[in-house]
Amino acid sequence: MTKTYHFIGIKGSGMSALALMLHQMGHKVQGSDVDKYYFTQRGLEQAGISILPFDEKNIQPDFEIIAGNAFRPDNNVEIAYADANGISYKRYHEFLGSFMRDFVSLGVAGAHGKTSTTGILSHVLSNITDTSYLIGDGTGRGSANAKYFVFESDEYERHFMPYHPEYSIITNIDFDHPDYFTSLEDVFNAFNDYAKQITKGLFIYGEDEQLRRITSNAPIYYYGFKEEGNDFVAHDLLRSTSGSGFKVSFRGQELGEFQIPSFGRHNIMNATAVIGLLYTAGLDLNLVREHLKTFGGVKRRFTEKIVNETVIIDDFAHHPTEIIATLDAARQKYPSKEIVAIFQPHTFTRTIALLDEFAEALNQADSVYLAQIYGSAREVDKGDVKVEDLAEKIVKRAKVIDVDNVSPLLDHDNAVYVFMGAGDIQTYEYSFERLLSNLTSNVQ
């Protein structure tokens, strides 16, 4: 039966992916959001999905309404109208929990790496068999005939608790979202509760001491680099400027060699988790091996472009662990170039909680530039932290730049520029691209 879905906050990464998925399954889909451009909206526009301004007229009693988790009656006219008129709606995670019951569902959770890992799993499985998927970069695919559903499982505010997947990967546990979680133990408890809802197989990075404490009713398979204590082991790594090669064994049995066109040790682990899950679920490893080779990455995860012979990398990294992984990947691919990091802290609460860790991570770059902190709609700037506080803690001299003047970035020869952040760091990137293009056009 065809339905009409209305998404309140359709540009959200998960929301846009779900909208695309339902659209491809033959449903009528529309949504509302702010006017400001966000990288997910291009896919919606290409699919012909209407993006409307917030307006109570968008809410109709016969629509199936899916609301983004950040919207409430006091900050959104559509939610307020629905509440006042008794029109029901589901939150994103509530809808998803019901939706996945019609499939064999495979979740990917973790503090870091879940979008990339979901992307790898979706790419490989959808090339083997009909698969629906929902990736946190705003990408979604829907098929009513699909047996499998791959999805990203988000821990923020325990949104993954409505999910009961057959299989799940957990990439790591780390302290993040300090506006919600009170401690690392609070984060662990959330993941441990989620783990108990897995029914057939849980795949855990075995070298994470927090993950080693996880318990589940489903069998637990550990993956990692070390042979001791892990079921799936990646070994004989060959990291080059064209990608990464490695072998995988399962409890002493060799499963063969694998290649991915990706960089950084973290991506080898992500791929190993996918190999372990699909092997356990009974998929043909030769097909897994074949399709790993063609994984092209996900949006805003080490996305590269060249402007005026200058390499620019765009990455969503907004936590110290993610910054370290991104810079490691850049050094693998560009070992002879200077690594210039341009980082925008995301949320005041995270910046305060992890200030020292951010400084330590950014010290892995050769040069560092900082953009002003991007505050979340969920918080108020109380003046407790400024980006200059982070700059002072970075051992290598860090400069604060303005989006209207990124010319200091030109002071580097033979450099790779790595723009990182979850806010509007892309506006700085675009300013730099325009500057580079103007330099070319002004040459006589």
Swiss-Prot record:
Belongs to the MurCDEF family. Gene3D superfamilies: Mur ligase, C-terminal domain, Mur-like, catalytic domain, NAD(P)-binding Rossmann-like Domain. The keyword Ligase applies. NCBIfam families: murC. Signal peptide: none annotated. It holds the Pfam family Mur_ligase_C. GO terms for cellular component: cytoplasm. Cell wall formation. InterPro entries: Mur-like_cat_sf, Mur_ligase_C, Mur_ligase_C_dom_sf, Mur_ligase_cen, Mur_ligase_N, MurCDEF_pg_biosynth, UDP-N-AcMur_Ala_ligase_MurC. This is UDP-N-acetylmuramate--L-alanine ligase. Its EC number is 6.3.2.8. ATP binds at residues 110-116. It catalyses: UDP-N-acetyl-alpha-D-muramate + L-alanine + ATP = UDP-N-acetyl-alpha-D-muramoyl-L-alanine + ADP + phosphate + H(+). It is found in: Cytoplasm. Coiled coil: none annotated. One of its GO terms (molecular function) is UDP-N-acetylmuramate-L-alanine ligase activity. One of its GO terms (biological process) is cell division. Pathway: Cell wall biogenesis; peptidoglycan biosynthesis. It comes from Streptococcus sanguinis (strain SK36). The keyword Protease does not apply. It is an enzyme of class 6 (ligase). Keywords: ATP-binding, Cell cycle, Cell division, Cell shape, Cell wall biogenesis/degradation, Cytoplasm, Ligase, Nucleotide-binding, Peptidoglycan synthesis.
